[in-house]
Amino acid sequence: PYRRQRQMCIRDSNLPGLVIDIYAKTAVMQAHSAGMHVDRMVIAEALSEVMGDKIENIYYKSETTLPFKADLFPENGFLKGGSSDNIAQEYGLKFHVDWLKGQKTGFFVDQRENRSLLERYAKDRSVLNMFCYTGGFSFYAMRGGAKLVHSVDSSSKAIDLTNKNVELNFPGDPRHEAYAEDAFKYLDRMGDQYDLIVLDPPAFAKHKDALRNALQGYRKLNAKAFEKIKPGGILFTFSCSQVVTKDNFRTAVFTAAAMSGRSVRILHQLTQPADHPVNIYHPEGEYLKGLVLYVE
């Protein structure tokens, strides 16, 4: 199934290993299995038939996602069209989507409902968006009435993209500042000026052998946030690691809260949206876990 939006995502458990995200009139297709790669042109033709004139371009991006043992050596490139127009909309906000060189298909569509939720909590708050990438959470916070928003990412390219997106949505707005800096170093040096913090790191573990270190990383990261956030603050914290279960993540976060000595209450338990369906026989498909926490 697919969901019609200006920015949308097609992920069907009956087509394992296939991801299609649609940004305005461009579909970005990604194969994670050899079978999907082999049938990429058939899939592109079927997508064109179903979507009609709603899409004009299909970009194939699988150089880094196919199994190495398959020895397929795919090349990224357009299967249809070739437009360089990369601006998409999400709930009224505009974003430059870097599907050529960006992470995944260029944007994290799986967080859109969680970004929208954050907007409701942002009014008059000082917001820190860690691992900001394109700045998605930051702009929802700004639209929600945040007093100030700081976006942090270790990648200078991500910060450049965030700043471009600021100019698309809030040109010249003095409330926003962006920093290219390691997350842990930033948390170490920052004061207690924030009362809403977003922790949305990249996957800390992509295989089970890395699980133990990943959980240590989540504990350390969240403990820093609990230590620094203002009393009465709101923490949005996430894990997108498939091998980290919901219980694993909750235990890591709750342990971090205990380590910090802060009293914490759960406001929301978050996951991916309906167009990222989870097959009940493949629970690992529920890769996105999130908590919204009130920190006393």
How does the language model describe each region?
Residues 124-133:
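Conserved class I S-adenosyl-L-methionine
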Residues 234-296:
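C-terminal catalytic and target-recognition region of SAM-dependent MTase-like enzymes
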Residues 194-224:
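Mobile active-site "lid"/loop adjacent to the S-adenosyl-L-methionine
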Residues 157-198:
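S-adenosyl-L-methionine
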Residues 1-10:
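Single conserved hydrophobic/aromatic residue that forms the stacking wall/gate
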Residues 134-146:
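Conserved SAM-binding loop of SAM-dependent methyltransferases across substrates and taxa
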